[in-house]
Amino acid sequence: MNYLDMLTRLGVGSAHPGGFSATMSQLSRFPLPAGSRVLEVGCGTGRTSCYLAKQGFDITGLDLRPEMLAKAKLRAQAEQLDVRFVEGDITALPFEAAAFDIVLAESVTNFADIGRALAEYGRILRPGGTLYDREVIATPSITVEAYREVTGFFQLNALLTEQKWIELLQASGFAEITVCDRSAFVQHVTDDQIAYPDMNQVMDPGTVLNASVWQTSLAHDDLIAANHDYLEHALFIARK
């Protein structure tokens, strides 16, 4: 079982670095303008999208996996929210140019062709629109062995340094780029669950007794621990 299959079965709502605590901190530090048309790419089970809908934003959540979207719709129903969820690929977004004011990504772009995804974010943002993208990044000192191990486990096309991210953002038409919250990539799950328990997480039937799920989870934890010197995460804020 691969990493994304594990997340899907568990119905994890905030698997990105820092968890939902990081999401809440980001939205507090960088509040979205009222009335913004917001696209969350890789919305997963819809936790962030539903939170923003509660705050009154016009929010669209997009994900590649129909199983995730089904859980997102269940979450919206449970929270009595009207949220648009769309199945789609971040490298070929099914939206017209300049359709959104804000694009949110939480550890999603890494799992696609990064350059193509960033170009699509730029295409569907209006002039002056903003991308907020929190991603795992490689330190400049990453070894070949660690690079191969991490990209192999997560099935990534590439694991970029901060500088390479900035270069690709610039190449995609983003002129004003800020890097925030750069820190070591460490496990956050327990603290995050205590601070922000997910009351609407939906696990697939039989998941608790599925050994493959927990084997993949342990392998993930071991991988992060073994490569902590080479992994960080950061929030990229880029204005079109």
Short names for language-model regions:
Residues 157-173:
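Short alpha-helix
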